[in-house]
């Protein structure tokens, strides 16, 4: 079969990426013939060259670390949410130019809705303040969250002014009374490595938990929250969720969500 449309994931390391699994399953389920999705090893400083030298058959690129900031700088057009979050995980060819977007925030929205159902969180705890945390903050805002306590080693409130519009955002360190903070929350969302939170899991596991980690799973935080009777959702839900929007931007076809999500369980 002739390959007429291509997409790929860019980053380093890249061998572990599940994006080909997700998009490949989407192509098959949607009946898209002539589509191919691959991995391309790419450092941040190489992104501009790799994308510019890609052939006309390339419709888009999924972008992972360390290339997310370079993708934002490279693009001819940047979506408002990517600008607010400060990084891009999606580059789509549109009428001969490249548009940067961040669909991680949609992935976080999918995961939070899976976790909470129809319940809208009013108060949240967000662990970490990096790029993934900013995507989760966007999702919390979309859900109408009113108050977010960010647990982080440093106070980065100044960086969140635009993103936090309409929300009361405060910062605290890991030395705070995290159990009290968690007990008052409708959801705890963690964006930091599992080992970072291991010693704080007992304190934070007192609310429904969304942990962006999917390997290893379950994390100590998820285990503690589940043992306390709370629902938990891991990073595979976010990974699948962000891929739906990418798939639709690249192909112009509605994502076959169920088939793509099920592909991660094979």
Predicted regions and their residues:
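Conserved S-adenosyl-L-methionine
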Residues: 142-147, 228-230
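Glycine-rich Rossmann-fold phosphate-binding loop(s) that bind the pyrophosphate
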Residues: 12, 128-130
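Phosphate/diphosphate ligand-binding glycine-rich loop within oxidoreductases
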Residues: 2-116, 216, 228
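Short helix-loop-beta connector
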Residues: 117-123, 205
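N-terminal Rossmann-fold NAD(P) dinucleotide-binding loop
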Residues: 133-134, 218
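NAD(P)-binding Rossmann-fold cofactor-contacting core
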Residues: 145-167
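Adenosine-phosphate binding glycine-rich loop
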Residues: 212-266
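Rossmann-like adenosine-cofactor binding region
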Residues: 165-234
């Amino acid at each position: 079969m002739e390959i007429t449309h291509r997409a790929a994931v860019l980053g380093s390391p890249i061998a572990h990426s599940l994006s080909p699994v997700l998009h490949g399953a989407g192509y098959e389920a949607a009946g898209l013939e002539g589509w191919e999705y691959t991995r391309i090893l790419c450092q941040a400083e190489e992104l501009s060259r790799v994308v510019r030298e890609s052939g006309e058959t390339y419709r888009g690129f999924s972008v992972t670390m360390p290339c997310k900031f370079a993708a934002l700088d490279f693009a001819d057009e940047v979506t408002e949410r990517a600008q607010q979050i400060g990084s891009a995980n999606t580059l789509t060819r549109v009428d001969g130019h490249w548009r940067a977007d961040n669909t991680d925030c949609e992935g976080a929205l999918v995961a939070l809705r899976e976790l909470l159902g129809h319940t809208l969180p009013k108060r949240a705890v967000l662990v970490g303040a990096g790029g993934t945390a900013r995507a989760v903050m966007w999702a919390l805002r979309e859900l109408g969250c009113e108050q977010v306590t960010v647990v982080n080693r440093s106070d980065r409130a100044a960086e969140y002014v635009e993103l936090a519009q309409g929300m009361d955002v405060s910062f605290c360190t890991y030395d705070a009374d995290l159990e009290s903070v968690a007990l008052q929350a409708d959801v705890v969302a963690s964006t930091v490595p599992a080992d970072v939170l291991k010693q704080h899991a007992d304190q934070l596991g007192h609310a429904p938990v969304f942990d962006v980690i999917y390997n290893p799973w379950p994390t100590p935080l998820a285990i503690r929250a589940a043992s306390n009777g709370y629902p938990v959702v891991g990073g595979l839900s976010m990974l699948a969720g962000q891929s739906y929007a990418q798939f639709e931007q690249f192909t112009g076809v509605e994502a076959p969500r169920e088939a793509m999500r099920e592909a991660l369980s094979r």
